[in-house]
From Swiss-Prot:
Residues 15-178 form the UBC core domain. This is Protein crossbronx-like. Belongs to the ubiquitin-conjugating enzyme family. FTS subfamily. InterPro entries: UBQ-conjugat_E2_core (IPR000608), UBQ-conjugating_enzyme/RWD (IPR016135). It comes from Drosophila melanogaster. Residues 234-266 are annotated as: Disordered. PROSITE patterns: UBC_2.
């Protein structure tokens, strides 16, 4: 007897598991300074953390969760991104700490969208908060700001009182760094644990990894490794990073002999 994969819950779950595993493999390759992994208990619940190294949010470390729809990836509903702590940003609701993805995606299309696109958007709103609230330019050349966002107070503060906004953001950055080492709120083994940098302990792992960039970074006097690693400083660099990754994925799909012929012809 033949069973439809739609009517067989077990097969549907297996297929969904493969989709989620594929998404995780893409996430590991696509972006820097932001990390996400499916929880051990449920693949629809992802743990994430972002390290912001530049811009007005520099020094911030924010934890978040990504909740995928039950029928992911077929469901057109967007994932839900929830931050663990209060984050001052026009697109983040101060009450439930959710990120508004509607300005980024209208609906989820499984053949076009991936979780790494959501992570890239999270990076973009912190790299360029002003750009994230603009819809274009007026005929006079002035920037047109959105009429409605999740946090209108943050929007008005950013648009009309930028120094005060920066002050509040920097205060939150200090708090976020203090909270990042707190005990995990869950016993899930996939929860991302962050430890303070300890040269005596971590240099041993770096030597094992034999990574030239890390060794060079840790050889700098009186500086943390993160200060010398590659950073994404603007939305332009985010676009360049995406273009590089798309090219890498495209090249990976081309058979090796065809790539060699293409390179020779160039």
């Amino acid at each position: 007897m033949w069973y439809s994969t739609v009517r067989n819950p077990s097969i549907a779950l297996i297929k969904q598991g493969y989709h989620i595993l594929a998404e995780y493999n893409l996430v590991k390759e696509e972006l820097k300074n932001i990390y996400a992994i499916p929880s051990y208990a449920c693949g629809l619940h992802w743990f994430g953390v972002i390290f912001v190294h530049s811009g007005i949010y520099a020094g911030s470390v924010f934890r978040f969760s990504i909740l995928l729809p039950e029928n992911f990836p077929a469901d057109i509903s967007l994932p839900t991104v929830v931050f663990s702590t209060e984050v001052l940003h026009p697109h983040i609701c101060p009450q439930n700490k959710t990120l508004d993805l509607a300005h980024f995606l209208n609906e989820w299309r499984k053949d076009e969208h991936h979780i790494w696109h959501v992570l890239r958007y999270i990076q973009a709103i912190f790299a360029d908060p002003e750009g994230s609230i603009c819809t274009g330019q007026s005929s006079s050349g002035d920037l047109v700001i959105m009429d409605e966002v999740r946090n209108m107070n943050a929007l008005n503060m950013l648009a009309k009182s930028r120094p005060e906004y920066i002050k509040r953001v920097q205060e939150q950055a200090i708090l976020s760094r203090n909270l990042i080492y707190d005990r995990p709120p869950t016993e899930d083994p996939h929860y991302i644990i962050v430890e303070p940098y300890c040269a005596e302990r971590h240099l041993k792992f770096m030597d094992q990894l034999k990574s030239p960039c890390w060794k060079e970074a840790t050889s700098m006097d009186c500086s943390q490794p993160s200060e010398y690693l590659g950073h994404i400083d603007s939305s332009r660099q985010l676009d360049e990073e995406e273009a590089n990754q798309v090219e890498k994925l495209h090249r990976g799909r081309i058979p090796e002999h065809q790539r060699e012929e293409s390179e020779v012809s160039l």
